[in-house]
Amino acid sequence: MAGSDVDSEGPARRGGAARRPGAPGGPGSEAAAGCPEPLSTAEAPAESATLPAWMRLYFYGMHGITLDVLVSSARRFARSPDLRMLGFSSPYRCLLHSLTHFALEKVYLQQRRCPNAFVFNFLLYPSAHVGLQTLAGQALLLSLGGGAGVAVAPGALDLALQYVLALYHCQVFLKRFLRLRYGRQRRRQQQQQQQQQQQQRRGALPVPPGARVPTAAGARRRRPRGPRGAGGAPSQGLPDLPRFLFFGMHGFLDEIFFTFFFNVLGQGDGTTSGHTSLWSFFMYGSCSFVVEKLYFHLHYSRGWGTWKRVPIYVIFIYVWELSWGLGLRTCGACSWDYSHYPLNFMGLITLMYLPGWIFLSVYQDLISNVLWRVQYVPAN
């Protein structure tokens, strides 16, 4: 969504956002038990593997932007209460979050080698986290400011906040995130099983494993996606709550990137950050969650193609944006205003961003296809 009157912390006006793809003891044995890597053969699904590096980097950047927005919004609200709950971050910080958290992941995985879990969890890892985040933040300030006098040493409150975030990463986030597994070979094996079943129904010989079966002329090919649940949706993958959290964080990512590039390219005011609102988390998280359900139903149950589904997505998105805008505007919490754009309705929706919604609707389907192959393996 667009923030219309952002103060000096962010751009003065925002034209709207193509948002939404539409997201962690004791010594010895206790330290080893608390480390999720690697899973034993009994714990890990036979067809799953650790999340690929690119996927972890993607999520670390998105998660880092979410923390930036939460912290900056809380600080801004404490100074000047504003129900729009604006928060700030930037693509630069997204890249830094991806790299620093990827490095801290490697530090976290050394937990088993530390003889004392308490020392690692409350001293060693937090020290590495605070030091790396401080260095990255100072490097970003120097590179953007262009002068040696720009960087300022962090205060005691900043260091305390970084320590709390380090405990969150070690005791909560990484402890659960690193138990996610990605099913790489599931699609091919399920496709072979379906082909074998089809051949057996026709009275033909079973297909040898790994062999391809030619599709009959004129036959309609449906991409197998595994066992189906209610409404034709895949019955495997992440539960609903983690999916909602992922979509909400991705809404932050989309808004930060869009507002940053909109202000750099459109206004040229030299801004170094983008902005969003805390309400966007719930708005885009719920919107993407429902659109994903539409995708599963229209694609798997009805067999609709992409360009037949996209108009349904876009209509729903506009209705959702208008409904949230009306609700937030009544209590002075609406962070966007499209009144200065043509083809707008009540300043809450505009056809100017139709191409962006179409692109993100297609991207949403791609994300859903990836997410259903991600599984959470709980600790024994």
From Swiss-Prot:
Sequence ranges of Low complexity compositional bias: 190-202
Membrane topology: Multi-pass membrane protein
One Gene Ontology CC term in the entry: membrane
InterPro entries according to UniProt: Tat_dom_sf
UniProt-annotated location(s): Membrane
Statement: the UniProt record of this protein carries the keyword ATP-binding: no
Transmembrane segments: 51-71, 117-137, 244-264, 278-298, 310-330, 343-363
UniProt entry keywords in alphabetical sequence: Membrane, Transmembrane, Transmembrane helix
Main location (coarse class): membrane
Region called Disordered, residue ranges: 1-40, 188-236
Protein family (similarity comment): Belongs to the TMEM229 family.
Descriptive protein name: Transmembrane protein 229A
Organism expressing this protein natively: Homo sapiens (Human)
